[in-house]
């Protein structure tokens, strides 16, 4: 069916005959004869040029059609010059062509030729085209306004007719189309029938179409133009005559609006499918602002807002057309749950809630983390490409080369820097303190007791006065205002034990000295071995960390082993490229063995805690995994087992970067010099330790896998309250251990019966821990295949089946198969670097 705006009696017949160019497959101009058009000419008084609309192109020219409808004028006065009117129309068409070219509508020239040369008029098609234009643009007018416009145009075309129109339908009727009364003129009906019998018409034998139904439940979506930039196939569920149908189950996932797609030029199409917060903000800011304005207009003007739609909330995405290859769920703007009430078990996922492994650091501040709802391997939800898998994304990117370790570390540093902006005040305070410390560090020339200043000698206590004579080199004797502990010790009761507390730890006082060389600044941490102090080395003029071991005989032997291991590792890695803490020196002071090392930052458990136990982005976890494996490779190259891998023993070497170093070799041993049979922290304890089996370097691989899982989720993978519960959590995922391990276990009777079946185990909440009832994918709440495969190879019952360090470094999870650099949003700002 063809919709007309106006006709002209003054156009020469040559122009009418010259318009024999094909309009579309829907209507052939050869079928439009003078006899066909004569009924309408008899009733036409317009002196404007003819505008013929092709409904096969209405979705491609919807905005132009709306502008033409709004620009229709009343009949010119009798004395008005026809040439001026024609010139005005020609100028208007030139502006429309310029607007069409700007919007990328490449078929406007053919449409304009049809507009200027055809000589038909019918208003029924005009109403359909006008309605579809409004649906496509998301700005469906008020039915009253549409009806009034129809009446005005009908009056303009037939000023002498006396048509009567039906009552204007209200919004409650939910009838988006207006109907003409049954009192249509005979000429009008005859013209409609003749047009419908043309090829493509509703009454054409090859494609009969249903008549317009008054039941809105049978409405269907208008068919999208095949010329649309984002369209490839016309929807078979569409019908121009029947109009849009109501939203049902089949429309819960549908294509994006042609209104939104028409504003996106093909040159920017790839940029627009990416999330604006991830992509180049400078290129998408204007488009995003325009999209937000149109969305607000849709909420204000759409008639579906007041219509009950089978428990489906209104969304501007309800007016949708396109091909089924790109679908998106209905965006429930009004009923979207808040972040605090988000249910991780719900199937609902708000748009933009998933990120890829190489995700933008700027979005990490607003996305949920595992074990809540984070999905690391899926592509960012977009209105055009939500259904594309990661495999298709990688193929589309065309980059399957492994990611270099340097690139991985740089990308993780960028993400870690943006994570640090959450605690900007704390990080800046730490950076400033460390900066002042380093600026105050000045190397001092050593002096003997005979060359000391009188002022320093007067500051010595009675105990120090006798003690200092045993030191040949003196660098620091304590700050002036320091309340030294030695002042409280009488000379006749001098004993090294008086400097210790009840646990054997040294009583460190800020401003006091160690070995008349190191100035105590602060206490960094404490443990079963003793404590770690932040100090200034006045000999080297640098800030160091000193591990002060407890004054207990049982710790002395292992401390000497630790010193030997640190020395060996530093000699094997002189360039400091394998992420192991740097050993500087060691000494014995007042009954305490002290190990001097470089000063590092927070441990990874503190990082998880500062992130509210929500876990870290996968790219950061991958970076930590790479660095940890490099450290383990160095250890195994020197036949060393760490024996106590846990997040607390992995420290950041820089507060703003994802760089870590392995520390605490107090439980470490060489392969042939195993000291303990019961070691490792419980959450990271290998099964062979629990079962009392022989152990080797493989226990570090088990602990390493547990650490990566905890970094990703924010909570321990196997949080057993005791060894029995710990074994129950492991069997929940891995099932019972092999019979070979049970038979060789020295503690098998505590956990298994004579047939190797595990005894019933309950956790602290009296929940029965049933073997083989959970998976890594469930515990980690992710489907990242390479990460899950990596963990499954680290966590095996039999140590011989676990992945080796060399194989782990070549695993797909470490190497990666895609490299998409994370981008920092314009709103974020980098924190200052630490002073050198």
Swiss-Prot record:
The answer to whether keyword Cytoplasm applies is yes
Highest rank taxon of the organism: Eukaryota
Q: Which positions fall inside the Protein kinase domain?
A: 518-814
Known InterPro entries for this protein?
Answer: Kinase-like_dom_sf, Prot_kinase_dom, Protein_kinase_ATP_BS, Ser/Thr_kinase_AS, Ser_Thr_dual-spec_kinase
* Comp. bias regions, Basic and acidic residues: 289-298
The catalytic activity of this protein is classed by the Enzyme Commission as: 2.7.11.1
Q: What is its main location?
A: cytoplasm
Phosphotyrosine modifications at: 678
Q: Which PANTHER family match?
A: DUAL SPECIFICITY PROTEIN KINASE, DUAL SPECIFICITY TYROSINE-PHOSPHORYLATION-REGULATED KINASE 4
UniProt function note: Has a role in meiosis.
Q: What is this protein called?
A: Serine/threonine-protein kinase ppk5
Q: Which organism is it from?
A: Schizosaccharomyces pombe (strain 972 / ATCC 24843)
